[in-house]
A protein has these predicted regions:
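Mature, structured domains of secreted/extracytosolic soluble proteins
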Residues: 2-9, 20-201
Length: 201
């Protein structure tokens, strides 16, 4: 009888220990699955947020603005899309119109987009990307008492000034353009369209 009681006690103890061990394994497995699920959810959420940011970026605005299709094509050729679509900015793009590019000679265009022209193209395009968020109204306010200079991504600067009722912009080389369509707003900046390509090339 004592032997039987001892055996029963031993069996119950062993069963309890085994059950506890399995519970620990299950908890560990469930914990791992939860961690994986959390990581996946976070990745999906980050991916969606990134896609939303790109869809509302200055690059998206350039792509959907008829006047800046050529400028956008060159931005893509120069591998600057990630900079202005994923960068927090803000960026103010002073974008030459399609017509502005059509005024350039074939030789000039070939030098910009030729096989060895990417570096030159990047330099020219970065000279049209201003660091900061500048609306046309804020620029007009700033030029009331004279010229207003802002830095570009290319390490150069652009200077805004008035001539009669026109708002103009010039670069260090002396090239001048007139602002036309302005304040095309995006999540990480805005776009102003100009009637000439700036830069010394």
């Amino acid at each position: 009888m004592r032997l039987y009681s001892f055996f029963i006690c031993f069996l119950l103890t062993a069963t309890t220990l085994l059950s506890c061990k399995n519970d620990v394994k299950n908890d560990t497995s469930e914990g791992a699955e939860t961690a994986v699920d959390t990581t996946v959810v976070r990745s999906v959420k980050e991916s969606k947020e990134e896609q939303k940011a790109i869809a509302n970026s200055v690059l998206a605005k350039l792509m959907t603005t008829d006047e800046t299709r050529t400028f956008t094509r060159y931005i893509i050729s120069a591998s600057l899309t990630d900079v202005i679509s994923k960068g927090k900015g803000p960026y103010t793009i002073i974008a030459p119109s399609n017509e502005a590019f059509s005024k350039l000679s074939k030789a000039t265009l070939d030098s910009l987009v030729g096989q060895s022209g990417n570096k030159t193209l990047q330099t020219v395009l970065k000279g049209h990307i201003v660091i900061g968020d500048f609306s046309s109204s804020s620029i007009l306010q700033s030029v009331k008492n004279g010229e207003y200079t802002v830095p570009t991504m290319g390490g150069t600067s652009l200077t805004f000034f008035m001539e009669g009722s026109d708002l103009l912009v010039k670069d260090a080389s002396g090239a001048v353009a007139k602002l036309g369509k302005t304040d095309i707003l995006s999540a990480n900046g805005q776009v102003h369209v100009i009637d000439a390509v700036l830069g010394n090339f």
